[in-house]
């Protein structure tokens, strides 16, 4: 009886151990089967892919960053060229004429004529179309201080520069004053200098303003003392530019 009881109990223990081993083996097999696809998915997630399924590599980190952000290089635009005609304008520079007269240069230094403007010393500046123009004029003057003594009023000189227009509706022989400037200079004498002229003095008369002009009218400059004009660079000029 005792031997049979032990044998029956040992058989039950052996069957129970076999069952545990079978369960453990099945669990390990399921774990292995689940781990394989998860590992494959993790590896695929780490591999860079583009929309077409191909991997692209860029050697330049900056270019790679631009590609990742979707930047595109735009084509270079050619500079636009303004083909519209410019407004009439002129800038003339004072130049000496024979006989101590005042003439005007149209091409030297900063002088120019544009958009159909024309000039001649005999007839003045001709503007090609009706419109509102800004006219300006600056005439530099210089002189020498006279000897000491005498009446101070006799030493004073009034310098005058004027802009006129002629032609067109005003007729060829009927000039009209447009703008004018004037300045009176009284040189300071040196009491110690009784004979001979003193040092040079310098001044300028300038003005500008808006004038309505018509095609065919001509604008010219008239000055009071052409023998005192200063022809140094930037001292004497006049011009016009259409503003409306």
From Swiss-Prot:
Name the InterPro entries on file.
TNF, TNF_C, TNF_CS, TNF_dom, Tumour_necrosis_fac-like_dom
Membrane topology, as annotated: Single-pass type II membrane protein
One GO location term (cellular component): extracellular space
- Protein source organism: Pan troglodytes (Chimpanzee)
Question: In the record, what terms sit under GO molecular function?
Answer: cytokine activity; tumor necrosis factor receptor binding
Name of the gene encoding the protein in the UniProt record:
LTB
Q: Which cysteines are joined by disulfide bonds?
A: none
What does this protein do, in the record's words? Cytokine that binds to LTBR/TNFRSF3. May play a specific role in immune response regulation. Provides the membrane anchor for the attachment of the heterotrimeric complex to the cell surface.
Q: Where in the cell is it found?
A: Membrane
Entries under SUPFAM superfamilies matching the protein: TNF-like
Topological domain ranges for the Extracellular compartment: 49-244
From the Swiss-Prot or TrEMBL record, give the protein name: Lymphotoxin-beta
């Amino acid at each position: 009886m005792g031997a049979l009881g032990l044998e029956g109990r040992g058989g039950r223990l052996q069957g129970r151990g076999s069952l545990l081993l079978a369960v453990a083996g099945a669990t390990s097999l399921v774990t292995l089967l689940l781990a394989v696809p998860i590992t494959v998915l993790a590896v695929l997630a780490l591999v860079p892919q583009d929309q077409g399924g191909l991997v692209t590599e860029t050697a330049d980190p900056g270019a790679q960053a631009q590609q990742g952000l979707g930047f595109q290089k735009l084509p270079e635009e050619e500079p636009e060229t303004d083909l519209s005609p410019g407004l009439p304008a002129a800038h003339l520079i004072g130049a000496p004429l024979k006989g101590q007269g005042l003439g005007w240069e149209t091409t030297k230094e900063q002088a120019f004529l544009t958009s159909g403007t024309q000039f001649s010393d005999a007839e003045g500046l001709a503007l090609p179309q009706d419109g509102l123009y800004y006219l300006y004029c600056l005439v530099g003057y210089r002189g020498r201080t006279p000897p000491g003594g005498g009446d101070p009023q006799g030493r004073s000189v009034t310098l005058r520069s004027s802009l006129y227009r002629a032609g067109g509706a005003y007729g060829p022989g009927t000039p009209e004053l447009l703008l004018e400037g004037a300045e009176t200079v009284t040189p300071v004498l040196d009491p110690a200098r009784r004979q001979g002229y003193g040092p040079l003095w310098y001044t300028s008369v300038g003005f500008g303003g808006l004038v309505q002009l018509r095609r065919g009218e001509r604008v010219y400059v008239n000055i009071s003392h052409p023998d005192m004009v200063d022809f140094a660079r930037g001292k004497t000029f006049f011009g016009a530019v259409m503003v409306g």
